[in-house]
Regions:
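Intrinsically disordered, low-complexity terminal tails/loops enriched in metal-binding residues
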Residues: 1-341
Length: 341
């Protein structure tokens, strides 16, 4: 819950018609959160993958899908933690920095949460996406002495935004919580600000010194099934395959996938496994657990998995680090119904 001047508050209230039914939904394999009935309180009983919470063990280990270390948590806990957002100044203006402060509260007791798990080198990931899906930020609030999280954010243009808080409270379940935000004085109407995505026809993209050839497996993606988003990376100048990617937040790549209506989200990291195996076999890792990612495999192919729950159009923002520079690729694609394949 965030504070605004009266005019901005009225705009925010109007936004809930857009967000009320869907603001808390997420992609099935990402951090869980939806408008579902609260489950009874329960203590940590298993070790869970933060990215694939449906995978659990009764002892520490690594996820067979993505290779991430499992953390102790409450599996299948569908309760949403409450996240309060305040901004200083209260009225946000495009192009001007503002201090954003987040406080997290437990669903059963409304007690403020002060302990969080570290997931990919950070305890709090924040995504800021404009409603037309043209603007994207992936940033990280810093822990404050009072248990809150804060950072300075500059919204690049006037309009509506969706803000996604991605964190895992210690002993709880991974969370991906959405907030609507609108800049002060914006007079545009909500429907005309919506994204109208067009699937990419050119799947070779260049950002900075990186050229990426993007592919999908299966092609096209199918709603309700896991698929792979693949990037084959080359140097822009000479065309040679890239093998010198640097790790970014503990992985060779990060991607956020969002549906056109901004209802469904997938937060995924580069896969470290070659074969997930089955219930009777161990996963085969592309990169041995604990190995130096950069030394073992710095490209050229980086693969992400994702499960898009519904047919429609989606946009992915995928980030790679090379030469101490962060490169962000935007990819727009279609997801078909199973019968349409």
């Amino acid at each position: 819950m965030y504070r605004r001047r009266t005019t901005a508050l009225l705009l925010a209230v109007a936004l809930w018609g857009w967000f009320a039914a869907d603001a808390w939904r997420t992609g099935a394999q990402g951090p869980a959160g939806s408008l579902r009935e609260a489950s009874p309180a329960a203590g940590p009983t298993a070790f869970v993958c933060p990215m694939h919470p449906d995978y659990t063990l009764d002892a520490p280990g690594r996820c067979p899908r993505c290779g991430m270390a499992l953390v102790k948590a409450t599996p299948f806990d569908v309760r949403n933690y409450r996240v309060d957002l305040t901004t200083t100044p209260a009225g946000l203006r495009a192009g001007q920095p503002a201090r954003w402060t987040f406080r997290v509260f437990r669903p059963e007791s409304d007690e403020q949460v002060t302990r969080f798990e570290t997931v990919h080198e950070r305890q709090y990931h924040l995504f800021v996406v404009s409603q037309d899906m043209a603007e994207f930020q992936h940033v990280h609030p810093l822990a404050q002495a009072d248990g809150s999280w804060a950072l300075d954010v500059t919204l690049p243009k006037a309009g509506y935004y969706k803000v996604l808080s991605d964190f895992m409270p210690s002993g709880g379940a991974a969370q991906l919580i959405a907030h609507p935000v609108v800049t002060s004085g914006f007079v545009g109407d909500l429907p005309s600000s919506r994204a109208r995505l067009v699937p990419d026809t050119a799947l070779v993209k260049t950002v900075g010194d990186l050229t990426a050839t993007v592919s999908f497996d299966p092609d096209p993606f199918v709603a309700g099934l896991y698929g792979h988003l693949k990037f084959l990376l080359a140097d822009r100048r000479g065309g040679r395959p890239v093998t010198d990617l640097q790790t970014y937040l503990g992985a060779l790549g990060h991607t956020l996938i969002m549906s056109e209506d901004m209802v469904d989200y997938v937060h995924s990291h580069s896969l470290d496994i070659l074969n997930a195996g089955d219930e009777d076999s161990e996963p085969v890792f592309l990169i041995p657990p604990g190995a130096d990612l950069e030394a073992v495999r710095g490209g050229p192919e980086v693969v992400f998995d994702g499960l898009m729950p519904r047919a429609g159009r989606y946009r992915a923002w995928t980030q790679f680090r090379r030469g101490d520079v962060l490169h962000t690729f935007a990819t727009t694609f279609e997801v078909r119904e199973p019968a349409e394949r």
